[in-house]
Amino acid sequence: MRVIAKFGGTSLGSGDRINRAADSIARTVEAGHEVAVVASAMGSTTDDLLGEIAFEAAASDRAEIVSMGERTSVRMLKAALSARGIEAMFLEPGAELWPIVTNDLGEVDVPETRARAETPAAQLERVVPVITGFLAENQAGEITTLGRGGSDTTAVMLGSYTDADQVVIVTDVEGVMTGDPRVVEGAQNVGRISVDELRNLSFRGAEVVAPSALSYKSNGLAVRVVHYQHGDLLSGGTDIEGEFENIIDMQEASLSCPPVAAPSLPTSPGILAALSQVLRAAGITIDAVSTRMDPLTSYLTESRPTAPENLRPSNCAAARP
């Protein structure tokens, strides 16, 4: 079985925890499995480094500075694996085998990254690559970052692009819980959860798996969350089931977009209900609504233009109950 194991900052937060992580990796390799490791910065290193930048730094310089957390982690973990007789190598941006590339927009260059991931994947039978999470490089070879939760994204992305069987997210909680165990007494582990359910929890503040990572989850890729104290990469925790589905609804049909403008209109109580009543009376369906400080724009499925006088703020105000 091919496994991508991602160790978060807490699970690598001390020498003892690095030893625990190395032991779990070594046991998995010795059981005959192929393992690639993604490592976050130790503990709060990234936040500490960011906090010490008390000057105006270019984005490229900031990326270089914060990358030192992950760069240290992969060296520590690689050394711990070597001490256990496991053939390992660390990979960081700039290395010949580095896989993750971003484009001019700072987004992952999917075709390039997918192609590059094939090379380290082909070596998994004989070596364990320990890869810096969160980091990438652009076409010019400069370090870039994948944003908050970027190590989760690194792991699930590489799991998808290397045809892994399973991605294991090693963190400081026993998988997904019924509540925050630091706050809710008696919180229990949820054995299984769907991608959609976990994504909704993530958008509401649950810090389990980054939403950006879930976008790379497919039905053929198992993803599991386990506690670093568990010590076993192949059991326990919470299984994340299903496949990511894009929640953006794309339509090719033409839409009318009449704006309604007045000072502080979107914050006026009852304005949306009033607008809806005016349009319903005209037999027009609202497809979506967009608000800013002053204008309120409706996207209408009706192909013919709406008479402007019908959408005057005074008419909308008159329609309020």
Features from the language model and the residues they span:
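Nucleotide/pyrophosphate-binding catalytic subdomain
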Residues: 1-213
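Structural beta-strand/beta-sheet cores of well-ordered domains, especially the beta-sheet scaffolds
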Residues: 3, 127, 165-166, 199, ...
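Short, glycine-/Ser/Thr-/acidic-enriched flexible segments
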Residues: 9-10, 42-43, 136, 151, ...
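Flexible, glycine/charged-enriched surface loops at secondary-structure junctions
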Residues: 34-37, 209-210, 221-231, 282-292, ...
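A conserved active-site cap/scaffold subdomain adjacent to cofactor or substrate pockets
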Residues: 199-257
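A conserved regulatory-domain signal marking ACT and ACT-like small-molecule sensing domains
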Residues: 235-321
